[in-house]
Amino acid sequence: MCGIAGIILFDNKKVNREKLIEATDVLKHRGPDAGDVYIDNESIPRVGLGHRRLAIIDLSESANQPMTNENKDVWIVFNGEIYNFQNLRAQLGHGHSFVSNSDTEVIVHLYEQYGEDAISMLDGMFAFAIYDKKTHKIIIARDRTGKKPVYYYKDSHKLIFGSEIKAVLKFLERHEIIMNEHAIPSYLVYGYTMPAQTFYKGIYRLDPAHYMVNKQNGSLVIKEYWSLKSRINDVSPNPVHASKDDPMLRLKLADAVKKRLISDVPLGAFLSGGVDSSIVTGIMSKFMNEPVKTFSIGFSEDPDYDETAYAHIVAKRFLTDHHSFVVTPSAIDLIDKLLYHYDEPFGDASAIPTYIVSQLARRYVTVALNGDGGDELFAGYQRFIAGSMSESMPGLLRGMFYDFSFLIPEQKRERAIPSRIKRFLKELKYPFIQRYLDWISYIRLDAINTFVKPELLYRDYKEEIISYFDSHIKGIEHASPLTQLLYINFKTYLPDDLLIKMDRMAMANSLESRSPFLDTGLIEYAFTLPDKLKLNFIKTKYVLKHTFKDILPRQIQHRRKMGFGVPLAAWFRGRLKDYAAGYLNSNTSEIYNYLNREAVNRLYEEHQKGMADHGLKLWLILTLELWLRTFKKGSEI
């Protein structure tokens, strides 16, 4: 893992070396081992590339970046890992001269030989920029699922890119740094911005499975190089692999884990005690010659959020070298640090334990495998149960159940079963997509106008959000409702929340995180499996649990899914109570330039009185307030 940054100037201005170094070094947490820059101020456009290195493969200085070929006419800055780099190197024809054993250098020569087609040949997680001096092109690419981030800013004079927004901001003048107020509604609904936008006007995320080509004249083209939709459309209606014990699944996941054990530094695994991380740990233990170092985290004050007992069961089963940590409410002291690493407000409070478990792991290893992606591929979330169940109901029955929802009283805890049933029933009156959107929302789409000031709600904002999600179904209308929901989740929540969180929190601690479940071959295979093998009535991840039943301890196979959350309900009635009040009830609160004070105060009071659990909503609003204060000061986020 590393950090990349760069600037391309289309006019006669030259790249400022000091500013390029500053933009690169602001990413030092992503790459503490080495850093350097490359500048070409002789050509048009002018090009500056910066790199911070976290050494994982080939620890020698010869693998440092920016890196070039033997002719010095192809340059690269690269963040990530390419798992098939040794095979690709062997496939390259004669005439290539290597100075290192790194995967980065293979990309350089692969581009020399295949041009843009080289991108689709890469198996791994990556974000990189290539400067082709012969054609004066800049190519910036991102991996298929979005494990590695790329942000960019472009106007008529320049193109700027970076692994994090903070690197992009270093190149901008203060008058160019403008808040994107239109990001607030989608943030309040889902906890992240979309599509591809950020809280800064003009700064965007490059979509996963896409690359951009910037030509000498400044024209920019963005292309998609991989599409999961085409795989979904190739699925046979009567697949031959319809067994709950699936040897092909076993083979593909084992291969995905094995290739992610390539490393010249110590590695381990995050172990929550859930199905996915337990399977990954079990497979690792078969391939490694020493005990797997595993890391888990829990919450002492709320058993609903504490999985450490399950993690210990798995650790004992595989004789791992296990380390655990208990999070206390004092973890809120990390909020400012997390905001710095996110560069934006963040709605997913599980960033806190993710940061802490990454910090714990980094004491012992430089690489950690995780279970991310298992829920996304094999229908592990309750939203998939709700979606499939509701779509199978006749319309009249949905209407009856919707009326019944008003008989269920509000609960003090969001995770309480009556709360979940009430939420499920309340959304039954809506069309399929909006039903799903409201189930995954923090604040329901229809309730946003209660919180956000009218002048901020641009016309058709609601339709725009719905149509964005709806657009993901175009081309796979024939697929089952479950497949459609899995695909939407794969294209939105996975890259825009889950993977951003894992990247930021791991890299904040100079830790590389690898996700075997997000292996391309496994993803494509999983989407060919019939629904009944993923969701068997209300049994989630059905085929996964059965295929690996010999690995999974019985207690893990049949345990209730807890999720990697934070006890916000208790925190906002305890340690966070006065902290939140100090920011949200102040005369200097920034959020009330955008939100209605009365609506926010009502949330806070209802939560404190135990009338409802608004912990998730309060976290969303609190982090927005903290970010706004920092932004208004003009200091770096």
Question: What are these language model-derived features?
Answer:
Residues 37, 149-152, 279-282, 377, ...:
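Generic hydrophobic alpha-helical membrane-span motif
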Residues 297, 344, 388-392:
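Short beta-alpha connecting loops at secondary-structure transitions
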Residues 18, 179, 244, 248, ...:
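Generic recognition of stable, solvent-exposed alpha-helical segments in well-folded globular domains
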Residues 302, 326, 345-348, 412, ...:
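Alpha-helix capping and helix-loop boundary segments enriched in small/acidic/polar residues
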Residues 144, 356-420, 493, 498-522:
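Active-site adenylate/phosphate-handling loop in enzymes that bind or generate adenylated species
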